Curated annotation (Swiss-Prot):
The lineage of its organism: Eukaryota, Fungi, Dikarya, Ascomycota, Taphrinomycotina. It comes from Schizosaccharomyces pombe (strain 972 / ATCC 24843). Signal peptide: none annotated. GO terms for molecular function: amino acid transmembrane transporter activity. Belongs to the ThrE exporter (TC 2.A.79) family. This is Uncharacterized protein C7D4.12c. Keywords: Endoplasmic reticulum, Membrane, Transmembrane, Transmembrane helix.
């Protein structure tokens, strides 16, 4: 500030609040300061004299506690004491000023403590981590501006609304620095017309290149930038100076800049301490400096200007719009996590998420890789993006997957709001599994027992042993593997080693000159629920749908996973062969112990039921899944009898399964994926046993224990060790071709609004 100017405060006793303007009596009369700018006698020629410095006052906190429309808030506005500029600290009147502010705070605290609703008023945050006046808390804020008339004083806000309010409040406080810089720039530009600048800042709405896409909402950044770039909010940074002679402006540029600096500091300090009225302050135009005579010692009081609530309404609109965008993005992320966790078809995940984002008018890009989804929310107004990574451990839960799909469809067809959908997804996440762990372990045993007759040529005598081995695998997977991260990485290998060792031990038991149990059937049936059939199937489907990254990664992992199982079978069988030289080396079951084909069809619904329970399917999903599974098995059985080629039989069987599932989804409004998946699991063990995938590991183990592994047979054994993985790939390719063909038949043009929730 100039050395030739002095700021003096004049304190006139004035009542701060009247009983008509507030709901509580004010026992203290506060002093409202007025400023007197004095100048020395050095510059007497062409002196502009003292100038009025306006101070924008914030409304009383009692006004925000009133119920009623926002548009009628003018009647509650009161004159709050203006906070002096920091440049006036040398005057020595700040102590008296602070005393008045403390008195007002004490009276407000007394009234707040008497009110049970407003006992702890929230504070308005700023970018410098400080807090200013009490924050306006609104309950049940909705996206419709007309429904915002009931402004309540409560601290319980939705998470997205609170986050949006904090963002708007912080950037409103940060706008003070933006205003100060614009004011200094306007003061330093000689002869610049401010009105022309305001016209240049306005965007031509008729320009098609200036407007973003109408089908998408703006992002978070574009809504926050409205606080800076909107013409209604930046007018306070434009200062209109009343000077007609440019030479006089240049002559007194130093003194004018000093006055402008004082004005900006007063305005900034007033907004900092009275932050709730920042929306009102931003809509006012700083008045022109009045030019008076050279009379020294004249006092000038602050003018009382009528407040406009358009800025406050604009801030409310930005806050609500920002909260709505954050809530929609939160729903999309939660939906993505739920679909991945509960086992949605991975090759259609990107399509599902794109459909959900399009309906919600959110611009989003999605990239799926196994176990991870990269989500990018774009902003068409600012050409920026907000990236999120959703990383989960994918499992299969058919029951909760159906619930997630119901929420997904309800939001797509406007039968459910986003807020209700988020609550529904949270409840699904928090809900316990439908079946307890010990029930899953028991049905692991039943699944191993029921798969033997129809896929691995097992007999009635083999069923109890298969049940014991299956329960052992279930205990390893559900009780031991989750407790140890190190063991979880070796679960497949150790499980196949233990079951293969015990299977050969039971198969070596002699009875009446022959073998009592079938070694190959027990070894294959024990690990049926940990076969990588679903992994290979998803990989082949992703490759067929041109998702090369996810399909290639998953297919390679499935092959390595298959080699792990084959290696475990070989090690387990070889260990028992090393201990017992009379161990069995048969890779097939005797014909005398095998069941008749007419009995095998009875085990298909039993095995399907075990799969449904293991995969947490609800009882309402059982009948359709069992019917589709039986139909697929019948088609596969007779096709294999006719063609003699197992890949062709798998393709035709999966085609029948896919057609039935998609028809059920189209007519019955069900989830085709949940109905089809157990039927696909029935196809995998049959094809694997028909092509001798598991028996290759048994052959390697037999060669090792009998010391027949030499240089001449090394190439044959190496091929056999890879046969398990290659057989799994062949089966998956046949099944994926049939499933894609079935989707093309039932949905020749796809689904227009939502993605196809099937294979």
């Amino acid at each position: 500030m100039d050395g030739n100017r002095r700021v003096r405060f004049n304190t006139d006793r004035r009542p701060y609040l009247s009983p008509l303007q507030t709901s509580f009596p004010s026992s203290t009369s506060f002093q409202t300061p007025t400023f007197l700018i004095e100048e020395d006698d050095e510059d007497t020629e062409d002196d502009d004299g003292p100038q009025v410095l306006p101070v924008h006052r914030a409304p009383s906190p009692a006004a925000f506690r009133k119920r009623g429309s926002i548009t009628s808030m003018d009647q509650y506005l009161v004159n709050m004491p203006a906070v002096p500029s920091p440049t006036a600290s040398k005057v020595g009147l700040l102590d008296a000023r602070n005393t008045d502010v403390e008195s007002y705070a004490a009276s407000y605290k007394t009234q707040s403590s008497s009110n049970s609703v407003n006992s702890l008023p929230m504070r308005r945050p700023t970018l410098d981590r400080s807090y200013s006046a009490p924050m306006i808390a609104a309950k049940n804020l909705q996206s419709d501006p007309e429904k915002m008339s009931n402004v309540e004083s409560t601290n319980e806000l939705p998470s997205t609304t609170t986050e949006a309010y904090k963002l708007v409040a912080a950037h409103t406080a940060a706008r003070l620095e933006h205003m100060r810089l614009n004011a200094l720039k306007a003061a330093n530009d000689e002869g610049e017309d401010v009105k022309d600048n305001e016209q240049d800042d306005n965007i031509d709405e008729s320009d098609p290149f200036a407007n973003p896409k109408a089908s998408y909402r703006g992002g978070v950044l574009s809504n926050l930038l409205k606080l800076y770039t909107n013409s209604n909010t930046v007018t306070s940074s434009r200062i209109s100076l009343k000077h007609t002679d440019p030479t006089k402006w240049q002559k007194h540029a130093k003194r004018t800049a000093s006055s402008n600096s004082l004005t900006d500091l007063l305005h900034a300090s007033n907004q900092t301490f009275m932050a709730p009225a920042s929306g009102l302050q931003s809509t006012e135009e700083i008045p022109q400096f009045s030019k008076t005579g050279h009379s020294r010692g004249r006092k000038f009081n602050f003018h009382h200007h009528s407040r406009k609530n358009s800025g406050l309404n604009e801030e409310y609109k930005i806050t609500i719009h920002l909260a709505d965008i954050l809530q929609r993005q939160k729903y999309i992320l939660k939906l993505c996590r739920a679909l991945m966790v509960y086992g949605a078809p991975s090759h259609r995940l990107e399509e599902h998420m794109a459909s959900a984002a399009k309906v919600l008018e959110i611009e989003g890009q999605f990239l799926y890789i196994p176990g991870c989804m990269i989500v990018s929310f774009g902003d068409v107004n600012t050409h920026t993006s907000d990236m999120h990574i959703v990383r989960v451990n994918q499992t299969i839960d058919l029951g909760r997957l159906k619930l997630v799909h119901d929420i997904y469809k309800a939001v797509l067809h406007d039968r459910m709001g986003v807020e209700e959908a988020i609550r529904g997804l949270d409840e699904i996440f928090k809900s316990p599994p439908y079946f307890r762990t010990w029930i899953l372990v028991v049905f692991y045993g039943f699944a191993s027992a029921t798969i033997l007759p129809m896929s691995f040529q097992g007999g009635w005598i083999d069923l109890p042993i298969a049940f014991i081995l299956g329960c052992l695998v279930g205990i390893l997977q559900h009780y031991i593997a989750p407790r140890s991260t190190m063991y979880n990485s070796l679960f497949e290998v150790t499980g196949s080693i233990i079951t293969s060792f015990l299977s050969r031990a039971f198969g070596s038991i002699r009875y009446s000159g022959g073998r009592r149990f079938c070694f190959s059937a027990l070894a294959e049936g024990a690990i049926v629920l940990i076969l990588p059939g679903y992994i290979v199937l998803c990989g082949s489907l992703e490759l067929q749908s041109k998702n090369i990254v996810a399909g290639g990664v998953r297919m390679f992992y499935a092959i390595i996973y298959s080699l792990f199982l084959s290696f475990g079978i070989s090690i387990g069988a070889a260990l028992y062969g090393w201990m017992d030289h009379n161990a069995t080396d048969s890779t097939s079951c005797p014909v005398s112990t095998q069941m008749d084909d007419k009995w095998k069809i009875l085990f298909v619904p039993l095995f399907t039921l075990c799969l449904l329970i293991v995969n947490q399917a609800r009882p309402s999903q059982w009948p359709v899944s069992i019917f589709i599974s039986c139909a697929g098995y019948v088609v596969n059985y007779f096709t294999a009898k006719h063609f003699g080629s197992n890949p062709i039989a798998n393709a035709i069987g999966s085609f029948a399964i896919g057609c039935l599932g998609n028809i059920y989804s189209r007519l019955g409004r069900g989830v085709a994926f949940a109905a089809v998946l157990p039927a696909i699991f029935v196809q995998v063990p049959s094809g694997l046993a028909a092509q001798g995938g598991i028996s290759s590991g048994i052959e390697v183990a037999t060669s090792l224990t009998n010391n027949t592994y030499n240089t001449s047979s090394s190439s044959t054994l190496d091929v056999n060790s890879l046969k398990f993985g290659l057989v799994m790939v062949q089966i998956a390719i046949g099944i994926s071709v049939g499933l894609f063909a079935s989707a093309l038949v039932v949905y020749p043009f796809g689904k227009r609004r939502s993605g196809l929730f099937s294979f």
